[in-house]
C-alpha cells in the first residue's frame, strides 16, 4: 500500500494524518542583506488624513485647532485662504488638513521687523479688528519696541478699534 492510498483512507474516515516534514533551513543573511531588509521594512510611511470643514468657536486660535487635528498653523491657513493667521472670526469655516505628515507652523507667519522707523511712511495708524502692536510693527517692518517707544502711555493690551497710534517716521 502506498502512502498516498493510506492518506486517502484516513481522510475518508475523518482521521487527520501528517507526513513528517523536513526541517526547513533558513539562510543566514549577510550583513549587507540584513541591513537592506531592516531599512526596507522599518521605514515608516505617512498617510495624511482627510481635509475637514471646521467652524471657528470662541477661544479658537490656529494653534489650538492645529494641535487638535495634528495639523500645522500654516497648513490650515493655506488650505483656508487665510492671509493673517493671527486673526480668525467666530463662525468662520476653515479647511483643516488632518494628521499632516510634516506640519508647517512657520512659513505663513510674518517675520518680526527690525527697523526703528518707517522711511517716508504714514505718521499714524488707525487700529482695525485683529490689530496688535506686534502685527502693526510687522506689517511696517518695524521693531515692536520702536513702535512702543513712539506710543508712550498707550497700553498695547487695551487697544480698541478706531484708536490712532503713532508710527515712528525717519
Swiss-Prot record:
**Domain of life, source organism:** Eukaryota
What the entry lists under Pfam families is as follows: LysM
From the UniProt annotation, give the residues forming the signal peptide.
1-18
The family database entries (InterPro entries) matched by this protein are listed as: LysM_dom (IPR018392), LysM_dom_sf (IPR036779)
Ranges for domain LysM: 52-96, 123-167
Q: Which residues are glycosylated?
A: 105
What role is this protein assigned?
Secreted effector that enables the plant pathogenic fungus to manipulate host defenses for successful infection. Binds chitin oligomers and polymer with high affinity and plays a dual role, not only in the suppression of chitin-triggeredimmune responses, but also in appressorium function. Does not protect fungal hyphae against plant chitinases but suppresses chitin-triggered plant immune responses.
Another remark in the UniProt entry says: In plants, chitin acts as a microbe-associated molecular pattern (MAMP) that is recognized by lysin motif (LysM)-containing plant cell surface-localized pattern recognition receptors (PRRs) that activate a plethora of downstream immune responses.
Chief subcellular location: secreted
Q: What is known of its domains?
A: The LysM (lysin motif) domains are small globular domains involved in binding chitin in eukaryotes. ELP1 contains 2 LysM domains.
**Name this protein carries in UniProt:** Secreted LysM effector ELP1
Please give the record's induction comment.
Expression is induced during the initial intracellular biotrophic phase of infection.
Please give the SMART domains that the UniProt record associates with this protein.
LysM
